From Swiss-Prot:
Biased composition (Basic and acidic residues): 78-91, 247-261, 362-371
Annotated segments matching region Disordered: 70-103, 185-274, 354-386
Species classification: Eukaryota, Fungi, Dikarya, Ascomycota, Pezizomycotina
GO biological process: mitochondrial genome maintenance; mitochondrion-endoplasmic reticulum membrane tethering; phospholipid transport; protein insertion into mitochondrial outer membrane
Protein name, UniProt field: Mitochondrial distribution and morphology protein 12
One Gene Ontology CC term in the entry: endoplasmic reticulum membrane
Domains as described in the record: The SMP-LTD domain is a barrel-like domain that can bind various types of glycerophospholipids in its interior and mediate their transfer between two adjacent bilayers.
Membrane topology according to the record: Peripheral membrane protein
Record keywords, A-Z: Endoplasmic reticulum, Lipid transport, Lipid-binding, Membrane, Mitochondrion, Mitochondrion outer membrane, Transport
Signal sequence coordinates: none
A Pfam family per the record: MMM1
């Protein structure tokens, strides 16, 4: 099934201009996180335009949305979860002690007595929700100071969450949710139904423990969001969770006997909260071909080392005038959210088959006999390489001699910028990363 896209209507007007500005700002922010080579001082992104040539879309399949699209953000639902737990605790208290819910008793209790604890003394609590003992090293839960966030951000929720996290554009962080008692990721196993409400309320009322300030900004280059954001698991990134847990290299973690016992005896982290599947949820797989005139304007400042290192910087203007793209897009509609991403070559071959198989199926619709190719030809028809097959670019700096730039590093700058554009696209828009639009 092929569909026509009103490209001009979708990319023009106030909404189209706002979307183009958001894309420009996003690419610009990503370039600020890239470790630049010695001969480039900075890269600025000035403009983005969708162009006038629309892509070619061919619908391949309607199916159920990927499970990753149903994951909820812990920071968005922390307040809801706490309210639900509070209501559950209140209803349990009222059901077990109905005589204490009378108005006369409540007034007498409020005036003359303190509120009794519904659980007997000595009731065992979960060791994981109790205050940290002296046997745990305080460096086990570091809290690095972060500008703009009082007290810093705790990395506990980030390292203890499941392998499925947030991607690229999800661009919102869920790691900061680890600072509250309900998003710590500890399991409630071993706790009774009554003790769960008590321990959570007790943990929420505790005063924060003093923790040492550890400076983690000792990296020589700015990390990209691929190294700071947890990614969704897929067939090609099953080890992403292991890599994430090893990114916080603090030398203060001691492998003592008490620490090992605490880790080994603790339960595994809870799985991510999942939204409920509904019959109206659907997902579309589309084969996208694009050879258009999308434009991206950048400026890279080149450093000149003569007569001394980093003597002066010259701006090099780079204009991306078009790209050639061939890949499989995924569009999922879940409630009032639209999730969008592309599939890698391996995932696309696994879901909809290699390109040669698609060509045979499309040719078979004409009821013409097709010759069966050999296995070597079939292997050569598999998708390979990146999704961006070609990026056309024009550079402007100073004068030219015989159609060539005078400066020697212009070619290096062009290759570096184009490689970063390709990397940003593949890291932020290729599954398991995806973008979410609220409609």
């Amino acid at each position: 099934m092929s569909i026509d896209v009103n490209w001009r209507f979708a990319t023009s007007g106030p909404d189209g201009e706002a979307l183009a500005e958001r894309i420009r700002s996003f690419i610009h922010d990503r370039f600020q996180q890239v470790a630049l080579p010695r001969f480039i001082r900075s890269v600025q992104v000035h403009a983005f335009d969708f162009g006038t040539i629309p892509p070619e879309l061919e619908i391949k399949d309607f199916c159920e949305p990927f499970a990753d699209f149903y994951e909820e953000d812990d920071d968005d639902h922390t307040s809801d979860a706490s309210e639900e737990r509070g209501e559950e605790h209140s209803s349990r208290w009222n059901s077990t002690h109905p005589e204490l819910n009378e108005p006369s008793y409540r007034e007498d209790t409020a005036v003359n007595h303190s509120l009794r604890d519904p659980f007997p003394d000595g009731f065992p609590t979960s060791p994981l929700r109790s205050p940290l003992g002296e046997h745990l090293n305080p460096h086990f839960l570091p809290r690095a100071s972060t500008p703009g966030i009082p007290g810093g951000t705790s990395t506990l929720g980030y390292h203890l969450m499941s392998l499925g996290g947030l991607s690229g554009t999800q661009t919102p962080l869920a790691a900061v949710a680890g600072g509250n008692p309900f998003a710590s990721g500890w399991s409630d196993s071993g706790m009774g139904p009554g003790n769960r409400g008590r321990s959570e309320t007790h943990a929420g009322m505790q005063h924060p423990r003093a923790e040492p300030e550890i400076d983690t900004s000792n990296s020589t280059s700015r990390p990209s969001t691929a190294n700071t954001l947890p990614s969704h698991p897929s067939g090609s990134s099953k080890n992403s969770g292991q890599a994430a847990t090893g990114r916080n290299d603090h030398p203060s973690l001691h492998a003592g006997e008490h620490l090992e016992d605490s880790v080994t005896q603790g339960q595994l982290p809870l799985p991510p909260r999942m939204r409920e599947r509904r019959p109206e949820d659907f997902q579309v797989l589309c084969h996208v071909k694009y050879a258009g005139d999308v434009r991206l304007s950048l400026t890279a400042e080149i450093l000149l080392d003569y007569p001394m290192p980093s003597f002066v910087g010259l701006p090099l203007k780079l204009n991306v005038t078009g790209i050639t793209f061939d890949g499989v897009a995924v569009i999922a509609y879940i409630r009032k959210r639209v999730h969008f991403c592309f599939l890698s070559a391996e995932d696309a071959d696994a879901l909809i088959g290699p390109e040669q198989q698609q060509q045979r199926e499309s040719a078979g619709d004409d009821h013409r006999p097709q010759s069966r190719p050999d296995s070597s030809a079939s292997a050569s028809q598999k998708r390979h390489g990146g999704l961006l097959q070609e990026i056309r670019v024009e550079s402007e700096i100073g004068r030219k001699e015989d159609g060539k730039q005078v400066l020697k590093n212009v070619g290096k700058v062009e290759r570096f910028v184009l490689a970063q554009v390709r990397r940003i696209f593949e890291e932020e828009l290729v599954y398991p990363s995806f973008w979410t639009f609220l409609i």
